[in-house]
Amino acid sequence: MLACVCLNPSFDRTVSLRSFTVGDVNRVLSARQDVGGKGINVAITARRLGIASCVLGCAGKNGIDAVRRKLDGEQVTHVFLPVDGDVRTNMKIVPQDGTGVTELNEPGAPVNAANQRAFSDLLAEKTVAGQYVVLTGSLPPECPPEYYRDLMLSLPERLFVLDVSGAALMAGLAARPFLVKPNRSELQAAMNRPLPTMADVHQAALELLEMGAQNVLVSLGGEGALWVSERGAMFAPAIPVRVQSTVGAGDAMVGGVMAGLEKTGDVRHALAYGAAAGCASVMTEGTQLIRPDDFAALLPQVQIQDV
């Protein structure tokens, strides 16, 4: 079973407009709300692709029942530690004129030191040696950037996948995660330099290996995805599809990769699964997750290239 950690779940509200003007009244064309959080998105994606998944996390007492109902409906098992506060609401403003998505993200309910210790115990209890465990998403208030690193160091027999950015990513590399998955922007921030070419991205991924990562998957949006390890590198070009929304595409890619690893144990197949899932994700509106039929149609079109 795939385990996904979600310490900061959310209600993701997506509004669509013809255009968005700061400082003016903007008329909404449509709106929808989904239960979100990167760990939740990864788990649901993997489950829709046939992989048994569970979510382990913390959630504000106000709203936790709605999160649980969503996961029950997706047949994803879950254990949440209730904490004081509300499940946060994130707003995604999507103009139809192509000017880009604006996101307004609340910080979430604080997870204090006692909660952190309790969750560490929960993760040890609910996972086993050799199991894939995905650590992803923003850390809630009061959680230090080293928290993911400390979880990994406390359970070295697990196969951790780290999909975070900034200080949490840099700290986490010391625990030698099985896989890290930055996008280009996150990788540029980690390297503190621009990475305009594929060669630049490849070199930066190699540097992450030197810092501790065992495998690096860089998601490159409409270009595709690059997998780098000590054994070599592979590139999966993006499949041309009609893009409805790019929100959650990175989570879908991670969910697809994990489904591929769980089913085959082969990183080449896992990259193909991730590429197909990421492309399937952008075919859905707002924060909706992938449709299995879209994934099944796209998977045979993925062409993995050795780099």
Language-model regions, residue ranges each:
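Glycine-rich phosphate/adenosyl-contacting loop at the front of the ribokinase-like
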Residues: M1-L56, I64-A66
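General beta-strand structural signal in soluble alpha/beta enzymes
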Residues: C4-L7, G57, F80, V134-L135, ...
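Conserved N-terminal subdomain of the carbohydrate kinase-like
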Residues: D24, R48-Q131, A297-V307
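Short beta-strand scaffold segments in enzyme catalytic cores
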Residues: I44, M91-I93, G224-V228
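Short, conserved phosphate/pyrophosphate- and ester-handling motifs at nucleotide-, phospho-/glycolipid
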Residues: A46, N183, G250
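Short acidic, glycine-rich surface-loop motifs adjacent to enzyme active sites
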Residues: G130-P140
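Conserved phosphate/ATP/ADP-binding segment of small-molecule kinases
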Residues: P145-R231
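Conserved phosphate-binding/catalytic region of the ribokinase-like
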Residues: A171, M198-V307
